[in-house]
A protein has these predicted regions:
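Extended, compositionally biased low-complexity polar/Lys-Gly-rich tracts
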Residues: 22, 57-62, 148-155
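A contiguous pocket-lining binding segment that forms or flanks enzyme active sites
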Residues: 54-113
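A generic structural signal for short coil/turn motifs at secondary-structure boundaries
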Residues: 45-48, 86, 135
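Conserved Nudix-box catalytic region and its N-terminal flanking loop in Nudix hydrolases
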Residues: 1-12, 16-60, 81, 115-117
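Nudix hydrolase/Nudix homology domain
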Residues: 34, 39-41, 79, 89-90, ...
Length: 163
């Protein structure tokens, strides 16, 4: 069974620098404001024809939402193949994927690849300490609550589970 969507925990490991968790501010229409988000999106029909549909969708979403293309030095792994978002209300499911970008220098990030109604307002490149603070506070640096998949990414990064 394939999930409906993929959500990505994206960690930047730049030589000589502290690792960073890459999150964005994405406008979420039901919430009525920008929320701290991970690169994520639906699996498209063409993803299903690929050898690994989930990884194909994750690479596409990374490119669309951050402008970053996976390179040979990067790693991608499945954290969870199928997580139900709110099984009491909907059958929506996501695969949770971890992407580690192993780079010599910081890649250029861009939200120019947004499609449809996607609307972004910048990135946060969090240190482990900053991720822990957001988790402890229960809200982002602007006082907004964040989605469950953002919480999962923060937990994965803040606890060192990604290593």
């Amino acid at each position: 069974m394939l999930p409906d969507a993929v959500s990505c925990v994206v960690i930047l490991k730049i030589r000589g620098q502290e690792p960073r968790l890459c999150l964005s501010r994405e406008y979420r229409y039901p919430a009525g404001h920008f929320l701290l988000s991970v690169p994520a999106g639906l699996l498209d029909p063409e993803d299903a024809t690929e050898e690994n549909p989930v990884f194909h969708a994750a690479a596409r979403e990374l490119r669309e939402e951050t402008g970053i293309t996976l390179e040979e030095s990067d790693s991608i792994r499945l954290v969870n193949p199928l997580v139900f978002s709110t099984p009491g209300m909907t059958d929506e499911s996501n695969a949770l994927v971890q992407i580690i970008l192993n780079r010599e220098e910081m890649p250029k990030v861009s939200q120019e690849g947004a499609v449809g109604t996607e609307c972004f307002d910048g990135f946060l490149l969090l240190t482990q300490e900053e991720a822990q603070k957001i988790l402890k506070d229960g809200v982002d640096d602007q006082g907004f609550f964040y989605p469950l998949y953002t919480w999962a990414a923060l937990m994965c990064f803040a606890t060192g589970m990604w290593k």
